[in-house]
Amino acid sequence: MEKNTILWADDEMELLKPHILFLNNKGYDVITAVSGDEALDIVKENRGIDAVLLDENMPGLSGLETLAKIKQLRADLPVIMITKSEEEHIMDDAIGGKIADYLIKPVNPNQIILSLKKTLDNKRLVSEKTNTEYRKEFGQIGMTLSDNLKWSEWVDVFKKIVYWELEMDKAQDKGMLDVLKMQKADANTQFFKFVEKNYVNWLNGKDANPPTMSHTLLKNKFIPELDKSESIFLIVIDNLRYDQWKIIQPVIQDYYKVENEELYISILPTATQYARNALFSGLMPSEMEKRHPDWWLNDEDEGGKNMHEEDFLQAQLKRLGKDVKLSYNKVTNYAGGKKLAESINNLMQNKLNVIVYNFVDMLSHARTEMEVIRELADDEPAYRSITMSWFEHSPLLDMIKQLAAKKVKIVITTDHGTVHVKEPTKVLGDKNVNTNLRYKQGKALDYNAKEVFEVKNPSDAFLPKLHPSSRFIFAKEDRFFAYPNNFNHYVNYYRNTFQHGGISLEEMIIPYITLSPR
């Protein structure tokens, strides 16, 4: 490892010789300065300085003045302030000046070493620790994985995998990343078997303790919050994966405390017209078709499939005996989000305000269709990064800040996630087969039954049955459906895109977050 060069500025340098020798013995080169002006000259002349130890109380330029000038010369240069003063305003000024650390005299050499390691070696040490810790956890997760896990155990496994993915994002050395990807793929293989074995049983009352699903979410989780709140906002961010929630969580936590973080399971297909309509209606698709034929549209029907979400919600609330004043808004672009954020005061008179945010879903589709977005979100870390960038500059964050100031409780959830698809599964169908790449429904489907979850009788899964011989098939793991005609072109176009509609951890295990204002 290369030696780091440290500039130490202090007007009592003679007294610090033992400390300098100690640093030399630990592998640091130390350049000294006895004033702020001398320190600035050295910074100007020597681009090889890696960090500065800066005394706060020096004759001439003070430490704080020197700090400001160093940052003008080299904003990236870490400065560790050393001072006798414990006055709070000096600490505040130093922190405001973007110091890397703050040490109170008298300092012992080990304190300085610790501060330098924290400042200069943080990323390397964190990276090494991340890889070491994941190696330990790898075996534990591997032993846990099987299709015999309970729903709650699958939630724990998925949380661990996402945790390590986000830790690997921060690590410089990604030596264990390929191992993590393989373990996630194995988890998805087992999760597919779990869903295949249990999904229909959950819906048909054959499991005494089924997980909360799209159509039971509001009744099981949200209505109790609504009952005890004067005013509450339900924010449904379409297509928000659990990992995407975890990266925007720290930003939200500046304004809100996470009261409860839960994961629920999306119904199949994990597509907006099915999952989000189920969420708002409290009904499965075949039940919506039967009870509300004027609002429900099947895959073959023309027109928008999510045009009656507010109607579905009103009907569910009525069934549950909840007569509340509510608003419903759907945001599909920046201008719409900005306009809604500006009207928060008008919404405060409602007990319930529902906001559907479509951006993340649009990003997923744009990632497929637009070359520039494909390059910006080439893989999952990049996809998370672009989500974070959107959120930090979105009207949604502005709205959340306003709601926090008004002390309003909010719930953030989603309808389904999305998965990064890589491998094609061949399927044949007639001209009426739907276009989704992760599920197909039709009367003349030809496929390899080992590569899909097939629902031969849609009624078993409470899905619409458009023809006597209709069936549904769902893609597993990271697969996507492709037709034999023009197969190679189709595969090249859709491989490495983000799709939803099928069965994977990322699509089905999704966040439901209750937040209270700070």
Give residue spans per PLM region.
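Feature captures the catalytic ectodomains and active-site-proximal regions of enzymes
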Residues: 11-12, 21-22, 57, 92, ...
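Two-component/phosphorelay signaling modules centered on CheY-like receiver
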Residues: 13-31
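Acidic catalytic/metal-coordinating carboxylates
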Residues: 34-38, 62-65
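Short amphipathic alpha-helix used as the core "switch/output" element in two-component signaling
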Residues: 41, 64-75
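Active-site beta3 strand of CheY-like receiver
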Residues: 47-53
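Active-site residues of response regulator receiver
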Residues: 55, 83
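Alpha4 helix (beta4-alpha4-beta5 surface) of REC/receiver domains from two-component response regulators
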Residues: 65, 86-101
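A Lys-centered signature of the CheY-like receiver
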Residues: 105
